[in-house]
Amino acid sequence: MFYKIAQKVMFQMDPERAHHLAIGSLKMTANSPLTCLYGQTIAPAPVSVMGLTFPNPVGLAAGMDKDGESIDAFHAMGFGHVEVGTVTPRPQPGNDLPRLFRLKPAKGIINRMGFNNKGVDNLVKNLIAKKTDIMVGVNIGKNKDTPVEQGKDDYLICMDKVYLHAAYIAVNISSPNTPGLRSLQYGDLLDELLSAIKTKQLELAEKHKKYVPIALKIAPDLTIEEIENIAQALIKNKFDGAIATNTTLTRDGVSGLANANESGGLSGKPLTELSIKVIKQLAICLKGQIPIIGVGGINSADDALAKFDAGATMVQIYSGFIYQGPKLIKEIVNAYRLK
């Protein structure tokens, strides 16, 4: 009930202003009696992924809490894990405003945020300050002004700084809003990046006597051959997981809607089928050797079950969470428990 009222107010506001208000409000109310307004108890439905045991298979996707400011509030809602970021080595403002658009009739969102964040050092402070023991993944990227050829250096810097504070690390090379970033998904650039990250992971594991899994987040706008090549690179470099998928540059199902022609990545319900298609193909190529976290267009428990059926071991929500609220978490967990 509270979420429906809050949503009605938020949806009258500019989307990015509403986002900042929501994160700020959650930050203020976390670990206080006011969590009763949005908190809920969800019976455990444990799932093992990447060598980790999560209390349930529903996580918050990266992009909602970029700087890790409201982690404890999302824990109160019942998420099995929270993925913060995308974070970059240095703070950056992101792309020009406006850069976030709702497509309400289609339950979609278009964003061209551009990795706006306060930098990895600020994120680490927030990870240290959190009071709950929720599993937190850290999604890392490169700064906009770092040449693609030197992009791996930014990922290694972020890895070094977040390693001790992350349950797992997600490598984001699939955002469409950082020029040239998606080129890291192909050929020699992909293999060089994954190899460098794996080497760094093993060095940090030896140094800290702690193994932190690494997952790669991929785009939905890939051919079968490109998915096969990514899968082979993941297996070759012994990555721990894959996250499929990021937002799409296609506009299937939204043509004619207000804001549909805005540039950026489309998420939400219009992404549902494309994401499932990629997960199915990726699962075939990975042959069970590497687990998949399914994300993209989950607006109901049935959408989540379709991700599991396609080959995902765990799921994440973002746009569906904005449109449906915290009840979606419980609905998915209950459906997962019964499947």
Swiss-Prot record:
Q: How is the cofactor bound?
A: Binds 1 FMN per subunit.
Keywords, ordered alphabetically: Cell membrane, Flavoprotein, FMN, Membrane, Oxidoreductase, Pyrimidine biosynthesis
Query: By which gene is this protein encoded?
Result: pyrD
Q: Assembly state and interactors? A: Monomer.
Q: Which residues form the active site?
A: S175
Tell me, what is one Gene Ontology molecular-function annotation carried by this entry?
Answer: dihydroorotate dehydrogenase (quinone) activity
Domain of life according to the entry: Bacteria
For this protein, the Enzyme Commission number is: 1.3.5.2
Family per record: Belongs to the dihydroorotate dehydrogenase family. Type 2 subfamily.
Q: In which pathway does it act?
A: Pyrimidine metabolism; UMP biosynthesis via de novo pathway; orotate from (S)-dihydroorotate (quinone route): step 1/1
- Residues binding substrate are K66, N111, R112, M113, G114, F115, N172, N177, N246, T247
State the name under which the record lists this protein.
Answer: Dihydroorotate dehydrogenase (quinone)
